[in-house]
């Protein structure tokens, strides 16, 4: 379970699937006697950090910055990260953490904001949905393509010594930007009216309302903006992202349009369609 909003509703299940299973895997390697021959990678999260006075960096957050998780999911990931470090130091294991910024692709779970946006835009384009509902349109994220991030994970496991690395693109964009780009892929230009909880977005040609702010998607503790320094990965792993966020957005919208077109054909022939949701 890796969804932040869901973790507030299911904190115990989140802890069990995130930090307890990390511990179980590490302990299984130790008990089986393969800790010297197997390499262990733990996918950590950039949102272990929160922009507070005591841990605010001079420029960017990095691998050594103080952590302040703000959700049950992030708390679970903090434990997973530190138990990985503990097993590395205690048992001389090759165990490393990748502190990753948001990485997206057409196979992203449907409950995450980027996929929710591209799915809604695809459905609106195909006349299968009326509106897209969101909350914090001004939240900023450093979105990268999953292909680039998996390459970074692989590179981390090719090193002689296990080390933790921050992985980011150094480019931040707002949810608002991502909505704009997604609609541009289906030739819809949108304009917004009002602000905050009353904000609505309209198709400039038809003035039909396509996007609304909805308080149901409010998070009790939101991370609005983070800056990450991935220079260590670029220097030691020679890792540089190849895909831009616009490339990724274009790919995701095109993939969802194709997916829903195929689903409509199947539905018209009485086939049941299974949706993809993460618990």
Model features per residue range: what roles?
Residues 50-52, 106-108, 174-176:
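A short beta-to-alpha transition loop/helix N-cap that caps and shapes the active-site region
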Residues 30, 39, 70, 77, ...:
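Basic side chains
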Residues 110-279:
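C-terminal substrate-binding subdomain of Rossmann-fold SDR/epimerase-dehydratase oxidoreductases
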Residues 1-103, 147, 153, 157, ...:
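N-terminal Rossmann-like NAD(P)+-binding domain of SDR-like oxidoreductases, especially those catalyzing
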Residues 13, 102-105, 139-140, 217:
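Short histidine/acidic/glycine/proline-rich micro-motifs that form metal-
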